Structure formats: C-alpha cells, structure tokens
A protein has these predicted regions:
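Flexible, processing/modification-adjacent segments and terminal tails
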Residues: 24, 28-35, 42, 110-186, ...
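Short, surface-exposed beta-strand/loop "edge" segments at domain boundaries and coil↔beta transitions
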Residues: 65-71, 96-103, 119-124, 183-187, ...
C-alpha cells in the first residue's frame, strides 16, 4: 500500500511539472513583429470599437518645462489633441507672451506649425517641421491618433523589425524598429509593454547637416545637428471601448554644442468621439 501511494505522488508531481513546463514560454523564444502588432491592436480594442472612434478630440492641461540649457520658468496651459482619419492637430496654449503656444497640424497633405511672435518656430515646431514624415505617416501621437500607423500598417509601405527586449525605467519593453523609404535619416523605435502590449514609448533620432561658413570667400563646412524626440504614453483608460493613454509626455533633446532639453507633459481629462471636425482645423500658422 505504501508503494502504491509513493508511485501516485511521483506521478502527480510529474504531471504538475510537465504542465508548468508546457505553460511557460521558452526563454529563447523570439517574438515576431507581426505577433507584437497583432497583440498591440487587441490592446486598443476590437476593430468595431476602433472604427467608431475615427474622429477624436482630447482635451486637458499641460506644462512645458526647461530641463537643460534653457533659461526660463515652467509654462502651463490648456491642450487639445484632435484627429480624424490621417488628419491631426496638437495645440498647447501657454501662459507666456514670448512663448504663447505649441501648434502643429496635418491636413492629409501638408504639415504646418505655429510661429513664435519673433517669427521663428519653437524647438518642437522646428523638429516636427523638419521631420514631418513622422506626422505624415501617422507615427506621432501613437494610439492617441485615429491615424496611428499601426492601425492600417499593411497600407503604409513600411517595415517593422522585432529588436528584442530593452530596459527602460527599470522595466523591460518589446522593441520594434520602424523603417520606411519616406523617413530618410530618421531612426524610429517603438516600445510596447510585455504583458499588455500597449504602446508606451516612441523614440525618434534625427540628424541633419548644415553648411556653415563665417567667411564668404571660403568653402563652407558641414556641421551635424542631432536631435532626439521621445514620446511617452501612460495612465491608460478604457473610453467607449478603446483603451487610450491619458498622460502624454514629449521630451526633445538637441545635442548641438551644449546639450539642451525641453519636456512637454499633458494630462487629458476629456475625450470626445464622433465629433464633426472642420478641415480648417488641421492647418495652423
């Protein structure tokens, strides 16, 4: 009798171990970009729910904070993020006469950005105008935008490559490299949570060359300008069947000469879908 009980326990233990091994993915198992994409789309909502939110308006409050290299105080103000199909608008009104707003829009054809009272573009406006294809291709704004590139990726003539896991703020994220003939010198990486597959971070590295000379009789020399823009998305909430981030943070670093950095942080509090949006909304000056 004792021998039968012992054999039963051994058999039961073997079954438990076998089940545990079958349920645990192999550590060396590599995901594909297609698998990450499929799971990411499911994290947003059903195709039916997403289709009902092709017109979106998000309203909230934001702040602009100088992090390095800029002299000035933190600015605050109201924020609006609107989109319909591929059209997009991002506006942050700020409490400063010298730096009154951030404005960027895309009407399906042209990217426009607001200008400062001096006639110059803001650092963010300059970056987005120079690297306008991240807006035209639907990458900027991530899942906040109805034109998010991953919603209709097959039609974008672009490529995704799975680049493994990467540490970010003490957590591991799935990394996808995005490439397209339209992105030029831009290096674009997209990051996703390992458990929910929500898109939580985009990184854009942009390098451009300027011809510089202090003497018109001499040949100009090339000087590189390197920029990095990071978008962060968090505080996800289900709104009318779609899961969207309520907190949106942009961080722009300019590595020319001395490193400078600015941060725009937004907290959305109101979401409106099915709004009728005028075409004029998606052009700013």
């Amino acid at each position: 009798m004792k021998k039968i009980i012992t054999l039963t326990i051994i058999a039961f233990t073997f079954c438990i171990n076998s089940f545990g091994q079958a349920a645990t993915p192999q550590k060396n198992e590599k995901l594909t970009a297609e698998e990450v994409l499929t799971k990411h789309l499911a994290s947003i909502g059903t195709p039916e729910a997403i289709a009902k939110t092709k017109s979106r308006v998000m309203v909230g409050n934001g702040r602009l904070t100088p992090l390095r290299g800029f002299i000035g105080k933190t600015l605050t103000g109201a924020v609006q993020f609107a989109s319909v199909d591929d059209n997009l608008l991002f506006v942050m009104m700020l409490n400063s006469k010298e730096y009154p707003y951030e404005k960027v829009a895309f009407n399906g054809r042209d990217v426009t950005v607001g200008k400062m009272p001096t006639g110059d573009r803001s650092p963010l406006g300059e970056f987005l105008k120079s690297a306008s294809n991240i807006i035209k291709q639907g990458i900027f704004g991530g899942a906040l935008s109805s034109g998010w590139v991953l919603l209709n990726f097959d039609s974008k003539n672009a490529k995704l490559e799975y680049a493994g896991l990467e540490n970010s703020n003490n957590r591991k994220l799935h990394k996808l490299r995005f490439s397209s003939s339209k992105t030029g010198t831009l290096k674009i990486n997209l990051y996703f949570e390992t458990d929910t597959y929500r898109h939580v971070l985009s990184e854009y590295q942009y390098t451009t060359s300027l011809s510089i000379t202090s003497d018109p009789t001499q040949s100009s020399r090339q000087k590189e300008k390197r920029f990095t823009l990071i978008e962060q998305f968090s505080d996800f909430s289900n709104v009318e069947g779609v899961t969207l981030p309520q907190t949106y943070i942009l961080n722009l670093t300019n590595e020319e000469d001395n490193v400078t950095a600015l941060e725009w942080a937004v907290k959305f509090s109101q979401f409106y879908f099915k709004e009728t949006l005028s075409a004029d909304l998606f052009k700013v000056s």
